Amino acid sequence: MQIFVTTPSENVFGLEVAADMAYEDLLAFVEMEASVPSKDIILSLNGNPIVDTDPKATIGSLGVTDNSMLLLTTKRVAPNPSTSAQPAIPTLDFSSIQIPGLPAAQRVDPRAEQIRTQILERADSLDQLKLSNPELAEHVHDSQKFSDAFTKLQNELRAKEVERKKELQRLYADPDNEDNQKRIMEIIRQENVEESYQNAMEHHPEMFIRTDMLYINCRINGHDVKAFVDTGAQMTILSEEFCEKVGLSHMLDVKFAGVARGVGSGKILGRVHSVPLQIGSSFFPASVSVIEGDQLQFILGLDMLKRFKANVNLRTNQLEIGEEKATFLGEKDLPDEFGKLGQEKEKKQDHGSAGDAFKDEDIVNLMSLGYSREKVVVALKQTDGDVELAASLLFSQ
């Protein structure tokens, strides 16, 4: 349920709580939100101060219900019960108070709305939010749902902070205990890691943006293909299936058959010594190794890149080779068989095996190159299920 607290400065903030929450935990939440020590807080419900109450009592037993409005005052300004000359706190009914312009069941947190507006004004902020909190990003176009998710997140953070403080209190009560010392060190380590993460997200959010791999448009023997530019691949590679598709199987020299060894091993069927490779309007004679299987199409390897003094120019987003400047393709231009990043890939993974979240067919195809299941799964995880990139990773390492 959601309750609202009014501060002495007439600010209102919402809290997502449960009826069985202890009163002392509610005070801890209010302390974090209002920056007032819990020992100085007095909460009033319907004008009646909640005082001399068992800290362990549930807020439901105290009469707090969904959409309750609590008034926050402090002991420094609260009436002194021992002084009869001071007037009593007037009895006010807050149960009927509503935030103007909004129905009781739908109140938007003004802080959440401010954050949502700022995010919508900056595309990079939305990208960062998608990485750090997908749930908030999902509701960024709906003010009410965003506010609800924001309130839920804030309350979860408060609850974690309350639990952390309680745990530290317990640990420091017996600092000589060896297990307590280990746990304290672990908490400190986690805090340092989290601080480093938050600093990186704040100052270098671009480091968390997924990077597109480098592909260019080209033609092999008159057939269009998206070439994966891989400076980590020693050889230029065609798959067996694609070799047949472009009509080069009859040119395969099986004397060069063998086994490619890297992290694992893959069967090389042979080599086609002269392949008409067209990039832009220029032709480049290429020698390609043909690999067993159908999970690869075409990888432009280091042998070709060095031979033609190619330059991977990330500043201009182009591959400069010979007189040509081929622009690297954006994610939206990649065909499905290359394992597009984002939504398309997630859909593929959703149909994968329950154990590894990858399709059994993809795992079997990669294992046919001579790699163990464990190494194949690791490669798929490293490439987010991208079969093309996983095969390249396994082969080129």
Curated annotation (Swiss-Prot):
Group of enzyme by EC: hydrolase
A GO MF label: polyubiquitin modification-dependent protein binding
EC number: 3.4.23.-
Top-level taxon: Eukaryota
Keyword Cytoplasm: yes
Coiled-coil intervals, chain numbering: none
A Pfam match: UBA
Compartment(s) where it occurs, according to its Swiss-Prot or TrEMBL record: Cytoplasm
Subunit structure and binding partners: Binds ubiquitin and polyubiquitinated proteins.
Protein name: DNA damage-inducible protein 1
Organism of derivation: Yarrowia lipolytica (strain CLIB 122 / E 150) (Yeast)
